[in-house]
Amino acid sequence: LDQACRALSPDLSRLPRQHLDIAVPTPPCPDAPHSSEEIPLTEYRSENPFGVRSDGTEPFSAQAGATSSPPRATGTLESGLLLEAFDAQLFREQSETVVAKLEKHLADLSIRGLDLTDPAILTDAARALMTTEREQVAAFDESKLAAIVDLYIKTGIQVHSPGYMGRQFSGVVPLSGVIDFVSSVVNQPSSFYEAAQLPNVAERIMAEELNAFIGWDPGSFAMVTTSGGSLANLTALLSARNHAFPGYWSEGALSLTGQLRPAIAVGDDVHYSVARAAGVMGIGDAQIVRLPLNERHQICVERARPVLDAAERQGLNVFCLVASAGTTPVGAFDPLDELAGLARERGLWLHVDGAHGASLLVSDELRHKLRGIEKVDSLTWDAHKMMFTPAPCTLLFYRNKEKSLGAFRQQASYVFDEEPDIYTALDSGEKNFECTKRPMIMPLWTLWAIHGRALFAQKIEYLCRLTGDVHRILEGEPDFETLHRPEANILCFRYRPAGLPEADVHDFQVEIRNRIKFEGNFFISKVNVDEVAALRVVMMNHQVTTEHFRMLLGEIRRVGQDLLRRTRRIS
């Protein structure tokens, strides 16, 4: 039986590669004559391994005596409104309504931050837009669609406004949003080539394009997309653990009997997703070795060595060192070249969470911030941050493509092929959590294909220069305190007017940020720096200028002085 099956199965690797023809062929006339003659299965397979006859028809069955045509559906759709919901002309009208509103939204460069709405009020507004029909399909209502889009836009953070300086997600390049719209309509889950051919090819192309800046051997590395940096970090840590402890996937913690406990080492400012990933893997907080930072908020390599030695004496087997390229609090870049040497000395897997800062690699001016990146084992890179595409779009790179298969060691015949061919070689399902995965690479690849690297490099360079400029502005303001020299586009500072008690500095910054947010003109964030709250700006919008930042400082002063007056009256 096995031999018979193999004889009947085509060797796909020997088939000619298919050429993609953009022109859509005219379908055969439905009234054309159709032969009812059945081709024997063996003859049918050998003559045409794709299972399509030369006249474009498909035999329904190869079994003797089977009917020559498939059975007809006997059910009917009772509701014309159901069919209308899928109507192409209506789709065009709906799209025009939405696009007109988005165009107006993008053209509005007024200064605004966030219209923060009471959740109960917003819930009532959303419910008021819902049909009360429960038994029948409700007719399309253009006014409801318009109201939904208006509400969606109005209640979001205004990421395209010059008042937006608060988070690490950006306003997208509009073209990338257009392609994301296409992805939503054509619905091609991209973990497997057969379901999403162009996205998988685009993923391979972008891997090669971006690896040119990382510097790994083109034939040895691998890249897979994931839905967010948190998932990428978890996947990389799983690969690192399974590499260090080969029996863990099959036998679990029992495979470690008599051994030191698995542990990871991280910088003290590492993103919380790394500790969360460790917990998911069964690595407790006591097994996370936190490495000290220097005055620039980077991992201090010299002080890290004795900490790692102490961890070993305490019964911990550190198998992975996690560094950061652009920490979330202050945007610091750990010294990757030195950490790579430390990891090599101790036989550690070196993973870099470059979710924010890896994008600096595409800039000739800023690439040096990641010196030594070619020596790391894995890298997380969020395109939805500094590559300005819709979220989520995260790229997980491995220096060794064989190790990219180490996170998950499973068999599932309904999706995984035991004998890969030229098509399944592009599948990524074996390398990541997701089976149904959005073709998130398409917006990034389209921007790269049409505009090229310079689109990203020029915007990133502008944002980093702008952050340096606003740092210099703050240095000249005696009532403001700068907390670090910016490495990229994140800057933390405090408003410290005369007469502010030291004990009140923390709460004062928190309250200023809250009031700025509620007033809705600017959107900034806050973070604890050395355990004291600070105001934080993240420059993600090229529409922001130093004049906008000076306006923000004026708002901070006004709000802060009002708080001081109120506090003094109360006291």
Language-model segment annotations:
Residues 50, 529-571:
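PLP-dependent enzyme catalytic core of the Aspartate aminotransferase-like
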